[in-house]
Amino acid sequence: MQIRTYQVDGYTPGVDYPIYNTVPFGLAFTCGGKLPGYYADPEARCQVWHWCLPNGRQFSFLCPNGTVFSQTTRVCDWWFKVDCQDSPRLYGNNDELYRDVNGNKI
């Protein structure tokens, strides 16, 4: 299997941005005590994101190489457009997922 890496001029893959080909084993992130929703994982430089269900169950996913999970938009975006280290401060954004158009909790 060939693994593609995407070079961005002036930057080094794996140094300036992550290039995992699988979700790394042993990440410390857990869904315990968190709202259901989507969470960037700074330990994996945000190339990994986690989906936390209401029952605490966790699923982990990998953004394509050259992209990382944006906690602001809750999608994978180009690595240079995301402040990964700021992600934990934005975890509360998941509360928006469970509100109606008027801002009432559903």
Residue ranges and their predicted role:
Residues 1-106:
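Extracellular secretome segments
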